[in-house]
């Protein structure tokens, strides 16, 4: 190949010229895409790159007499060591100009990182070079990569064994590097706490810190944050913030339940991988599910105490980002559906911060994870049942008792039907208190309400819990749950719903409103209706909406007297899955048959059209032939006349 041009130089000086000379020539000839340097410049961080002179690799490529050593000149040992050192820092392979600049910057960043420069010569003298350094990577004329060994002059297609071993070593070294920065660890935690509201993105934050973290390349930063979020960052940060509560506003990765009451500060043990990325919202400002400063009103603290009694149980279930239910009594009922929601954290007093869950993108990202958790943890509890419990819990008394039942039993062990019947009894007793029965479901019954717990700016003590249940338009409650309308319908099983609805109606007088409610529970896909419920967060007029949406099933009092659900029970509540599957299959088959039939007709039409076109072409050809023959007849006639005249 091209190797013969440099062969004489290489013979005289075995090791050095082969290194300093032949490969730069080769790299000039083909801009070699050498061994990917992302691993290399991570690897350099492990070596103490304390070389006082910057690695001028571009010089070695030039033809200056100091660097292009000829055969006759001897080499001073210092130069030899220097090129060895530069070579070793490169990882021996990156010679293309793009990677030169890449390595150059990485080396400069790691230069300040060294403990003492005297380590380096000893290292190079211990291991003069790696056997993997002899290999370099090139592109053949056909465009494939091949690997060339400059010592044995062997070229091969597959990646050499030495390179694979070295990559393995570098990976192990990187793992050690990632876990061996205690100073950086503490510093990053403090920086992230201090700049929680100043809008740094996490990468920028770590880059600007003046400690050793500034020396890490970006990809290692992302790795450390990913590794260490699980290992140390969360527990440490929590203990830190609990010991000095007023010092920092709030840390971007910790999601505290806003409980000023006595909640045990047990750290998170599990946390999803994608959560650190989401901890910055559109402004990069602060945490994802930041909750309001809790009201110090008495009812709120009651519910908090109940939460803290059962707070230890859900910790074992928590798999995803715990978007905790706000403790100010806004929707405490959304704590039981998410078993991840009640994870207790150290009580952190929070400065009043505007709600940040209004970003629909974040909600859209969070929703699948939370739904998956709900299905994992509460596989035995249907979402529709939780809905019905929330729908039935109308008044303050029934709400309090049901929350207490939920929280004492724990999310795995509640008996839904008994709860519903009790709630229905309570609601019939408290029915004269003129509260709209559907108003509670405006925010709590929607199965998505735990994705966006309605976030309020801090409320004064004067707001009791009862108005929050009937949700009058309190001025300080922004509507946050509106972006959720885009989500699809949540699966409900239509089988168990009518039974629970019947239990309700066994205890209640049969009124159009209760029928409405049961019909809303029976509707198999509560897509738009439920979301319209949840979107009217600050609205007390939910019942008129529902009546307009489901006006089909309202009975006049005269008819209601003659109406008995027992007579139609046998046609209610059949499992619709089978019928739905059949219907969808038949619809698809009909659609396919129709498309096949239409395509056949289309091909026939095209065929006929082409036949017509062929006929037209043939007709024009015949016309042309007729015209041509007529022309020839005329000419022959003329010639005949001339001949007869000549004769």
Curated annotation (Swiss-Prot):
The modification Phosphoserine is found at residues 53, 131, 142, 225, 446, 511, 523, 525. Residues 1-138, 168-353, 428-549 are annotated as: Disordered. Phosphorylated on tyrosine residues. Residues 129-162 form the WW domain. Keywords: Acetylation, Chromatin regulator, Coiled coil, Nucleus, Phosphoprotein, Transcription, Transcription regulation. InterPro entries: WAC, WW_dom, WW_dom_sf. SUPFAM superfamilies: WW domain (SSF51045). The modification Phosphothreonine is found at residues 293, 471. Changing residue 475 to L: In a colorectal cancer sample; somatic mutation. GO terms for biological process: chromatin remodeling; DNA damage response; mitotic G1 DNA damage checkpoint signaling; negative regulation of proteasomal ubiquitin-dependent protein catabolic process; positive regulation of DNA-templated transcription; positive regulation of macroautophagy; positive regulation of TORC1 signaling; regulation of autophagy. It comes from the Eukaryota. This is WW domain-containing adapter protein with coiled-coil. It comes from Homo sapiens (Human). The gene is WAC.
């Amino acid at each position: 190949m091209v190797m013969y041009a440099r062969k004489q130089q290489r013979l005289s000086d075995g090791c050095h010229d082969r290194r300093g000379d032949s490969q730069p020539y080769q790299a000039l000839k083909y801009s070699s895409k050498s061994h990917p340097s992302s691993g290399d410049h991570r690897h350099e961080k492990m070596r103490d790159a304390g070389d006082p002179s910057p690695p001028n690799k571009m010089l070695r490529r030039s033809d200056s007499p100091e660097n292009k050593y000829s055969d006759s000149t001897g080499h001073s040992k210092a130069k030899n060591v220097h090129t060895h050192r530069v070579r070793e820092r490169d990882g021996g392979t990156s010679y293309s100009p793009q990677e030169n600049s890449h390595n150059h910057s990485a080396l400069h960043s790691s230069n300040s990182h060294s403990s003492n420069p005297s380590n380096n010569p000893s290292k190079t003298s211990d291991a003069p070079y790696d056997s993997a350094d002899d290999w370099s990577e090139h592109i053949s004329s056909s465009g494939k990569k091949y690997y060339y060994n400059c010592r044995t002059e062997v070229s091969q297609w597959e990646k050499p064994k030495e390179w694979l071993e070295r990559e393995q070593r570098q990976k192990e070294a990187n793992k050690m590097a990632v876990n061996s920065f205690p100073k950086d660890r503490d510093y990053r935690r403090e920086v992230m706490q201090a700049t929680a509201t100043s809008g740094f993105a996490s990468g920028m934050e770590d880059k600007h810190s003046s400690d050793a973290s500034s020396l890490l390349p970006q990809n290692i930063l992302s790795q450390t944050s990913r590794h260490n979020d699980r290992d140390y960052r969360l527990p440490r940060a929590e203990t830190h913030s609990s010991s000095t509560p007023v010092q920092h506003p709030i840390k971007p990765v910790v999601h505290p339940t806003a409980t000023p009451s006595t909640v045990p500060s047990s750290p998170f043990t599990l946390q999803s991988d994608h959560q650190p990325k989401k901890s910055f919202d559109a402004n990069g400002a602060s945490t994802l599910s930041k909750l309001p400063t809790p009201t110090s009103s008495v009812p709120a603290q009651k519910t908090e105490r109940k939460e803290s009694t059962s707070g230890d149980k859900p910790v074992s279930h928590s798999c995803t980002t715990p978007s905790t239910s706000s403790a100010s009594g806004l929707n405490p009922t959304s704590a039981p559906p998410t078993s991840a929601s009640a994870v207790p954290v150290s009580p952190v007093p929070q400065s009043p911060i505007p709600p940040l869950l209004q970003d629909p993108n974040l909600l859209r990202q969070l929703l699948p994870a939370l739904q998956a958790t709900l299905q994992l943890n509460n596989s035995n509890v249907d979402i529709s049942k939780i809905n019905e419990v929330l729908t039935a819990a109308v008044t303050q008394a029934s709400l309090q008792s049901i929350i207490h039942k939920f929280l004492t039993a724990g999310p795995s062990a509640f008996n839904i039907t008994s709860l519903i019947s009790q709630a229905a009894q309570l609601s019939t007793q408290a029915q004269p208190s003129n509260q709209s029965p559907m108003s509670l479901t405006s925010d709590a019954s929607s199965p998505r309400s735990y994705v966006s717990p309605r976030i309020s700016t801090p409320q004064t003590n004067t707001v009791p819990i009862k108005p929050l249940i009937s949700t009058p338009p309190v001025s300080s409650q922004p509507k946050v749950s509106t972006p959720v309308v885009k989500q699809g319908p949540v699966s409900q099983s239509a089988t168990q719903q009518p039974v629970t609805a019947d239990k309700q109606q066994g205890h209640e007088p049969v009124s159009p409103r209760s029928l409405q409610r049961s019909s809303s529970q029976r509707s198999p896909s509560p897509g738009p209706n439920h979301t319209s419920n949840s979107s009217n967060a600050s609205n007390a007029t939910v019942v008129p909406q529902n009546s307009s949406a489901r006006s089909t099933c309202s009975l006049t009092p005269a008819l209601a007297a003659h109406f008995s659900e027992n007579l139609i029970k046998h046609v209610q509540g059949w499992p619709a899955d089978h019928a739905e599957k059949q219907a969808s299959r038949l619809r698809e088959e009909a659609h396919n048959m129709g498309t096949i039939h239409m395509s056949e007709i289309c091909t026939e039409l095209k065929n006929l059209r082409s036949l017509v076109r062929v006929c037209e072409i043939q007709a024009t050809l015949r016309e042309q032939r007729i015209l041509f023959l007529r022309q020839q007849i005329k000419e022959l006639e003329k010639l005949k006349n001339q001949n007869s005249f000549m004769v």
